[in-house]
């Protein structure tokens, strides 16, 4: 299965609590931190919820 790299590019400070919890659930802490996750519908849904805070790129 494909993998994706998710990078936190904007701060979740001042966002609604559900968005802050989604950022933590993705494994992102500080700005510019990155994680590599499997590309599946659950992760894609989380990315959609915080798409204004993260950048996503495909890992080969």
UniProtKB/Swiss-Prot annotation:
Biological-process GO terms, alphabetical: translation
Family annotation (SUPFAM superfamilies): Ribosomal protein L30p/L7e
Keyword Ribosomal protein recorded: yes
Keyword Lyase annotated: no
Keywords: Ribonucleoprotein, Ribosomal protein
GO MF annotations in UniProt: structural constituent of ribosome
Source superkingdom: Bacteria
Subunit details: Part of the 50S ribosomal subunit.
HAMAP family, alphabetized: Ribosomal_uL30_B (MF_01371_B)
Family: Belongs to the universal ribosomal protein uL30 family.
Designated name of the protein: Large ribosomal subunit protein uL30
Gene: rpmD
